[in-house]
């Protein structure tokens, strides 16, 4: 039951953060996928969360030619999250969230360049594509790191509450 609630909460947070007005690339999406990689031991659940939330939000904001690269970038974020635990240190979460944002940046901008419509299909064109993507990267990195720290901290606190409530219930029942 807990996995269903966590999945549903993450799905709603991811979709809504993408649909409400926001700064370019400043959404919960990356943090949700990093967290999903850490939280769900069954990797198919993380993948289902990613695909469903992206497809639903893309249905509303529009499908586009860069979708394969964007989805691949988000898949990389799940892969980075696999190396984290819900109780990972803040420093580790910060470092891995930054690495995930960087992976997304490199993959998604490579996809934009491969499309061949905005930049020359040369090394210089690739570098130009990455340079032009830097303003988007900073916003995403700040969002991914900040939202990841928040999600992991929230999960730590909520998971700490569950055993405490279970122990309190056992104590009350044993007093009778």
Give residue spans per PLM region.
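Hydrophobic transmembrane alpha-helices
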Residues: 1-38, 45
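Membrane-helix interface segments
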Residues: 2-6, 42-48, 67, 87-91
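Alpha-helical transmembrane segments of multi-pass membrane proteins
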Residues: 10, 30-34, 70-78, 145-148
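Central hydrophobic cores of alpha-helical transmembrane segments
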Residues: 10, 46-56, 93-101, 168-170
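Structural signal for the C-terminal ends of transmembrane alpha-helices
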Residues: 16, 36-42, 79-88, 153-162
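Interfacial aromatic-anchored transmembrane helix boundaries in multi-pass membrane proteins
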Residues: 16-27, 51-84
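Short helix-perturbing small/polar motifs within transmembrane alpha-helices
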Residues: 50, 69-109
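Membrane-embedded alpha-helical hairpins and interfacial helices in multi-pass inner-membrane proteins
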Residues: 90-165, 173
